[in-house]
Design a protein with these regions (language model features):
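Aromatic- and glycine-enriched pocket-lining scaffold segments that form the walls
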Residues: 112, 116-152
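Proteins synthesized as precursors that undergo proteolytic processing into mature forms
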Residues: 92-128, 240-248
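Broad, structure-driven detector of short, well-ordered beta-strand segments within folded domains
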Residues: 28, 68, 149-153, 275
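C-terminus-biased signal that marks the final domain/tail of proteins
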Residues: 1-13, 127-128, 135-136, 144-147, ...
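Short, surface-exposed beta-strand-loop junctions and turns on beta-sheet-rich folds
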Residues: 20-22, 81-83, 156-159, 166, ...
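A contiguous strand-loop segment
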Residues: 1-93, 121, 126, 311-315, ...
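Beta-strand residues in well-ordered beta-sheet regions across diverse protein folds
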Residues: 15, 76-78, 151-152, 285-287
Length: 327
């Protein structure tokens, strides 16, 4: 499964974990302004905003998992199995396949008002990319530096929710996830005072007891609550190093270790990668399961007026910076 989050210091940060039992060979992909997107039902788009994100490239087409555009909008698709239902292609509407939803939004939206206007006339359909790539059951988080929304296509239509916590995981649906945060209304980063009974002499015996009851398992509902609490209470300096470090700490609160989430005999879900995008500056940072050294790709270091995507395979081998000894 997966977890996505937003965070703001001086700049705006957006990212996610990809938690799964295997990789599709995803890469960091920069799509320049003049790459020709061929949308299945909406024709060609030859000019658009530049995009950087994590994608599986199939037939020279970037199938984005998460991405930002040069205007500072971030978007990620996360598993929503059992609840996602896409519409049928309808004449007279802007029919957008789920696999092209991220570039459809990021290629043309510079503000969240533009995102909302686009969604109001969009028909999200289940047209597959290819026979071997059926439509994935997803829902999405879209955000800029000021706000975030969640988009879910379900049996009764397309729903757009304000997302005040800037977090998305998987099931259950977003409205239910938000409601369940009521269960944690008493949690605090501060040490608790005895409100159990004034005549019972109860005292704290450890630091961190204000968050007793915050779930620690790897289910999507628990990850939602844990990252929401961590994100909403996280304190960071404004420098790039401090901000990026803090963002990775926020998503690190739901890091999945091999062996803790068995999905089949001998197969385990792990955090394949964690991303942190500085959406203000167009930089894509990431770590992988075996490489916790933060790697970075800057979209503005490439020719953004080009026609061909630039791909950077993830550096997955662990790296150690020695202070003495072996180099």
């Amino acid at each position: 499964m997966c977890t996505a989050a937003t965070y703001r210091t001086k700049d705006f940060y957006f990212g996610r974990t990809l938690d799964y039992e295997f990789s599709y060979g995803e890469e960091i992909v920069i799509t320049p302004r003049n790459y020709e997107f061929n949308f299945r039902h909406m024709g060609q788009a030859e000019e658009h905003y530049a995009i950087i994100g994590m994608a599986h490239v199939a037939g020279d087409y970037p199938l984005y998992y998460d991405a930002i555009n040069e205007k500072g909008i971030g978007m990620a698709g996360l598993n929503f199995v059992g609840n996602a239902v896409y519409a049928e292609v309808t004449e007279g509407k802007e029919n957008v396949a789920s696999f092209e939803f991220i570039p459809w939004v990021l290629r043309q939206c510079a503000t969240m008002d533009e995102v909302r206007a686009l969604l109001a006339k969009m028909n999200l359909v289940g047209t597959p990319f290819a026979e071997q790539f059926p439509a994935s059951q997803l829902h999405w988080i879209i955000a800029d530096e000021n706000e975030a929304i969640t988009v879910e296509s379900v049996a009764d239509g397309l729903h757009i929710y304000e997302n005040p916590v800037g977090v998305l995981t998987n099931n259950p649906p977003f409205a239910q996830q938000m409601f369940m945060l009521n269960n944690y209304i008493g949690l605090s980063p501060k040490q608790p005072e005895n409100s159990f009974a004034k005549d019972v002499p109860l005292n704290t015996y450890s630091r961190g007891m204000g968050a007793l009851g915050l779930p620690g398992d790897l289910s999507s509902a628990s990850r939602f609550a844990r990252v929401a609490f961590t994100r909403m209470n996280a304190v960071s300096g404004d420098s790039e190093a401090e901000s990026v470090s803090q963002f990775f700490h926020i998503l690190g609160s739901v890091d999945q270790q091999r062996g803790c989430c068995e999905v089949a005999e001998g197969k385990y879900e792990i955090t394949i990668y964690t991303s942190c995008c500085n959406a203000t500056r167009g930089i894509y940072y990431y770590t992988t399961y075996d490489n916790h050294r933060i790697m970075g790709v800057d979209m503005h270091a490439e020719d953004l007026d080009g026609t061909t995507p630039t791909c950077y395979p993830m550096i997955e081998e662990g790296q150690v910076s020695w202070q003495n000894g072996p180099n």
